[in-house]
Each structure stands twice: as C-alpha cells, then as structure tokens.
A protein has these predicted regions:
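C-terminal lobe and adjacent flexible extensions of AdoMet/dcAdoMet transferase-like proteins
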Residues: 110-170
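A short acidic, Gly/Pro-enriched loop at the edge of an enzyme's catalytic core
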Residues: 1-9
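A short glycine-rich, Lys/Arg-flanked "PGG" loop and its adjoining helix->strand segment in the class I
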Residues: 23-38
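Short, glycine-/aromatic-enriched active-site segment of Class I SAM-dependent methyltransferases
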Residues: 11, 44, 48-61, 115-133
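Conserved class I S-adenosyl-L-methionine
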Residues: 38-85, 99, 103
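Substrate-binding clefts and catalytic carboxylate motifs of secreted carbohydrate-active enzymes
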Residues: 87-95
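A short SAM/SAH-binding and catalytic strip from SAM-dependent methyltransferases
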Residues: 8-22
Length: 170
C-alpha cells in the first residue's frame, strides 16, 4: 500500500518466507526504497538438508490445525519433551542432530534465561515454527537474485545467524 521510493531503508526480518511466494515478495520490497537507500532481508536459509528438519516432516499436519488446538498440542508435547530435550540438546555433537530432528525449539544455548523462561520460550517458538501456512526457506542465490531483480546492487551477506543480505538501491 506504500507509494514507490518513499523510504530510505526497507527491511524484513524473518517474515518473507511466510508469504505464498517468498522470492517475489523479496523482489518487490525494493520498490518502496529511494535510490541510494538500503534493503536488508533475513530469511530462513535453505540448504540441501533443510527439508529433512523435524519441523518440516510434521508441518503438513500442524499448519492445518486450528491455532487453539495446535497450541494445546504444543504445550502438551513441550511439557513432556522439554526436560528430555534439555539434556539431549546439550550432548556434544549429537545435540545438534537431536535439535535438528526433534521438532522442539532449542534454547539450551541461551544462558541468560532460567529453566522456566526457556520453557516458555520453547512453547512460544515451537508454536511459531509449526503454525504458519507458508514456510519457504531460500538459498543465498535465490534471495540475491530477487534483490537484484528489484534493483538492488552491492548485495552482501551479514555474518549473523540465518540468511541476511543487505544491498543498495541504484
């Protein structure tokens, strides 16, 4: 709904992969940015093994559930599995495998949260990862192609977690 070229910067953090066409959404964001402005986008990164992640195996079911029912399911599941995953996710090397295959968010590496805060965060983020109608991770090449198509140049990747690209509108 915005006019073209009205903002000095446009950004999206973890949203575009939840649209019906993430690549198209990424290529249209630059339209609202003035020449010389910046566009920054963060999305889930798709790697060859991404779709083997436990969440993608159950999402075909969970994304069809009513939110209230899914939240109950998540609360029950997290209540049962949280104490176990608190241990499994901490095992050197194997912890990463468990975190990848068990569709429960991993907060074991968040030292500033106590047990209850981690539990609540796991419930919230597990619901968040299982509920969206769309979840389309992108490769670096796909996101960069979308930005270039939208008129963005000097695209570079930022070192933070996830796929974070930033560039300048020409």
């Amino acid at each position: 709904p915005f006019k073209s070229e009205v903002f000095d910067m446009g950004y999206s953090i973890g949203v575009l992969q939840h649209t019906p066409d993430a690549q198209r959404a990424a290529s249209t964001l630059p339209r609202v940015v003035r020449s010389g402005g910046q566009v920054a986008i963060t999305v889930y990164e798709r790697k060859p093994w991404t779709l083997l992640n436990g969440k993608y195996l159950i999402r075909p079911l969970t994304r069809r559930l009513k939110p209230e029912l899914l939240l109950k399911f998540v609360k029950i599941t997290v209540t049962l599995l949280f104490p176990v995953t608190e241990l499994l996710f901490r095992i050197p090397l194997l912890g990463r495998l468990f975190s990848f295959t068990i569709p429960i968010c991993d907060y074991t590496k968040t030292p500033n949260l106590n047990f209850i805060q981690r539990y609540r965060s796991v419930v919230l983020d597990t619901f968040d990862m299982l509920s969206p109608a769309f979840d389309s991770p992108m490769t670096h090449a796909e996101l960069e192609e979308a930005l270039v198509k939208g008129g963005i140049s000097h695209v570079r990747r930022l070192p933070s977690p996830g796929l974070n690209l930033i560039g300048e509108k020409v």
